Amino acid sequence: MCRNNASRAVALLHGAPARVETDGGLIAVEPSGSGASVDMGEPRFDWDAIPLAYAMDTAALPVGWEGLDQPGAVSVGNPHVIFFVGDVDAVPLETIGPEIENDPLFPEKVNVNVASVIDREHIRLRVWERGAGLTRACGTGACATAVHAMRRG
């Protein structure tokens, strides 16, 4: 279960704090207003924790696909690769997403994020979610992208 779904399930079914087992481990979910908040845990930047197939600098991977290059990689309970681009809508995520998701560099496959920094408080994001395809919302993708943006300065 993804963390978005875990938080919604707890909010809708229980309305009380809970701990939920996900593929990324046990997470704490707290009711919050009409929804719930999730403790995402610490992001992991080590190549073997993401995981990648071999050691490399996860702040700027020395790889590229069709005009997308030097992405960052981070695990927030699941693996993400993040590309900063000028226009997220110009990236053919429907075609390049599955190619990157299934690249041998990512032994557990990977979520593919393309992001544009709007200003210091806003990022526009599109996500190709591993195993699900293009998605309209991805909480771990938003967290991974924000962490990588802060990491890049």
Give, region by region, the residue ranges found by the protein language model.
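Active-site proximal loop and beta-alpha junction motif in alpha/beta enzyme cores
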Residues: 1-137, 147-153
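Helical hairpin unit composed of two closely spaced alpha helices linked by a short loop
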Residues: 140-142
